[in-house]
């Protein structure tokens, strides 16, 4: 399988560990990710001008050159999906293409890397790669953007793909009612107090389930729940100590890849206890 690969800005900044695990895992799954040359930001959280916002993603979609485009970031995925939907409008499409060197025909399909594993590869083909089934409990956290706007990949309200992946790796996906609730990352800069409130809700519920970790699919969610976890503990005078790991890191552990190659030593919340328990 081969995809045009759009890493997004975070993989070259705050999510180096995610980038490491994507490279380690997908090469072993024989899935080729051909990184788009000279890619640009998707527009991130919000760009007021609609034409500019859509054009940023359309430029990336046009660069896919006939392949489906895969991305590891929920925000990038959502923006690519929204751009595709918006470009059904012929007037907008013409305006956008006037600004692009490579015109976009509207036929590129964006996919999140979770969809690539769960649907395109499938758990049957993944199974032989799982050499060290994980004996842990894990929270499946999708975030607020992976299944929105609504698409055919998974349910926007009660998605199951990450739950099923966790189970396929030998771990137990715990029941988690906040699986699609916002982590607070998008408002961290403008309203840190509210952002920490939202993060606290997610972390406390995860702790109450008895889970060993929270599994995420988004670099912004990881940044909020890992890097800001100490701030949550300090603000609310509580102890969380909950490792936050990417789904690719979870796959890598089950495949027997070293924690260092997966970037698990780069997290702010220690993953040592999780790694030890997963390997028992």
PLM segments and residue spans:
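Iron-sulfur cluster-binding electron-transfer modules in prokaryotic oxidoreductases
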Residues: 1-280
């Amino acid at each position: 399988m081969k995809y045009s690969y759009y890493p997004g800005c975070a993989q070259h900044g705050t999510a180096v560990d995610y980038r490491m695990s994507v490279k380690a895992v997908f090469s072993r799954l024989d899935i080729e990710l051909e990184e788009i040359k000279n890619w640009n930001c998707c527009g991130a959280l919000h760009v007021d001008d609609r034409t500019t916002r859509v054009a940023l993603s359309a430029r990336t979609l046009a660069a896919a050159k006939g392949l489906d485009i895969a991305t590891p970031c929920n925000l990038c995925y959502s923006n690519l999906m929204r751009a595709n939907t918006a470009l059904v409008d012929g007037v907008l499409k013409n305006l956008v293409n006037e600004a692009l060197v490579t015109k976009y025909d509207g036929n590129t399909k964006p996919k999140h890397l979770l969809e690539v594993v769960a649907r395109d590869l499938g758990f049957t083909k993944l199974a032989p790669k799982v050499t060290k089934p994980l004996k842990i409990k894990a929270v499946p956290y999708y975030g607020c953007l992976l299944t929105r706007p609504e698409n055919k990949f998974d349910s926007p309200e009660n998605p199951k793909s990450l739950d099923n992946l966790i189970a396929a790796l030998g771990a137990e996906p715990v029941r988690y009612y906040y699986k699609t609730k916002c982590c607070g990352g998008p408002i961290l800069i403008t309203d840190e107090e509210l952002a920490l409130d939202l993060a606290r809700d997610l972390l406390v519920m995860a702790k109450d389930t008895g889970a060993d970790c929270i599994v995420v699919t988004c670099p912004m969610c990881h940044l909020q729940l890992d890097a800001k976890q100490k701030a949550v503990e300090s603000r609310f005078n509580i102890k969380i100590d909950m490792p936050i790991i990417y789904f690719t890191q979870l796959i890598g552990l089950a495949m027997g890849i070293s924690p260092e190659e997966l970037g698990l030593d780069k997290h702010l919340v220690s993953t040592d206890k999780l790694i030890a328990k997963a390997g028992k």
